[in-house]
Amino acid sequence: MDQYCILGRIGEGAHGIVFKAKHVETGEIVALKKVALRRLEDGFPNQALREIKALQEMGDNQYVVQLKAVFPHGGGFVLAFEFMLSDLAEVVRHAQRPLAQAQVKSYLQMLLKGVAFCHANNIVHRDLKPANLLISASGQLKIADFGLARVFSPDGSRLYTHQVATRSSLSCRTTTRSPLRSRCPCPWRRCCLTSLPRHWICWVNSFSTLLTSASQLPRLSSISTSSQLPCLPIHLSCRFLSV
């Protein structure tokens, strides 16, 4: 850590704290994710290992956040990423007015190119959401947080876990016990991402073919109850809220 000067705290995730830092020699601004090891015998957390492996296997790409270095520090280790000014969730949340169509198209194009690059390298992200889409000062969008990523089996022989992150953007296929033998969750999440802000809803129709069926579109805005989903898989079980 001696080669970096901490400039401030960016945030905190499930497995570590993220700091904004400056490389002492080069002056480069980076984001440092400090991951502490709870017990030495447990070794590296699986999510951190997956993220490192996925980013190293894919290499550099303008639509995927760059991992610059990994090094031990104290009772844990540090991942050094290129610094990005914000994320899509913050951009939408603090927008004074609806985003221009040209800006929406630009973000969506960069997202799709990033996902295409991941899939071309047999990497399935499995946790696409606005908070994991980082935005640079120049407006460049990059996919980040590959902690739930998996190496995809082209022949479809590998069965994947249902634990594919955020419940609010889980695909219909995932919630109905269907085996995850394909890249299915990513197309669904791309549609969920474009439907989040109200002024983005029009873009969902353009990508309806990415869903299992166009007839599923009206259900995106509906609220499910326990009677409508009596056989919800155990890995997704939770108490339904009264509305």
From Swiss-Prot:
Keyword list, A-Z? ATP-binding, Cell cycle, Cell division, Cell projection, Cilium, Cytoplasm, Developmental protein, Kinase, Nucleotide-binding, Nucleus, Serine/threonine-protein kinase, Transferase
GO biological process entries:
cell division
Entry's Gene Ontology molecular function annotations? ATP binding; cyclin-dependent protein serine/threonine kinase activity; protein serine kinase activity; protein serine/threonine kinase activity
User: Catalytic positions?
Assistant: D127
Top-rank taxon of the source lineage equals: Eukaryota
Every Protein kinase domain range? 4-243
Question: Listed GO cellular component terms?
Answer: cilium; cytoplasm; nucleus
TM annotation in the entry: none
- Which Enzyme Commission number(s) are listed? 2.7.11.22
The UniProt catalytic activity note for this protein reads: L-seryl-[protein] + ATP = O-phospho-L-seryl-[protein] + ADP + H(+); L-threonyl-[protein] + ATP = O-phospho-L-threonyl-[protein] + ADP + H(+)
User: Which InterPro entries does this UniProt record tie to the protein?
Assistant: CDK, Kinase-like_dom_sf, Prot_kinase_dom, Protein_kinase_ATP_BS, Ser/Thr_kinase_AS
A Pfam match is Pkinase
Please report which protein family the annotation says this sequence is part of. Answer: Belongs to the protein kinase superfamily. CMGC Ser/Thr protein kinase family. CDC2/CDKX subfamily.
The protein's name is Cyclin-dependent kinase 20
Q: What is the lineage of its organism?
A: Eukaryota, Metazoa, Chordata, Craniata, Vertebrata
